Amino acid sequence: MQDLKPPEAGAASGFERATLRQFNIFLENRVGRLAALLHALETVGQHVNAVSIEESADAALVRLICANPKTGRQCLLDAGFSFSESDVIAVGLPKQDDHPLIRITRALLSAELNIHYAFPMLRCKIGPAIILYVDDRTLAAQILIRKGFTIVGESDLMPE
């Protein structure tokens, strides 16, 4: 078995630390609720590093990642938002690679890992990156590092 390529400086060196904390916020499907959520985070100095919004008839599910999960969590609690948390991985997309998403999906397919959902990062020090929620984060990170990808850690998020 080949040795794992260590993550770049700043990227998390342990696979568990390489996961990012994602907040899954349930919003009523009403005008202004998203603005209220973003304003609450802004008032405590939290920048949104990644966001995905799924709408249904009565509610919206907002998935987001901020630079400081502890501060973000407390903000959501204080503002009365209903939310849950999950761990995801973020993978840097090399600028010199014409088809990084194809390489990522093929690498994970080779280990029979399912990607449940994905969305882009808005703010990341290393450049373009994608958030992945997969069956096994540790195995996915190991495989992607072997294939030359960088796993984004908390220190790679844009500052608060």
Predicted features by range, described:
Residues 1-160:
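A conserved regulatory-domain signal marking ACT and ACT-like small-molecule sensing domains
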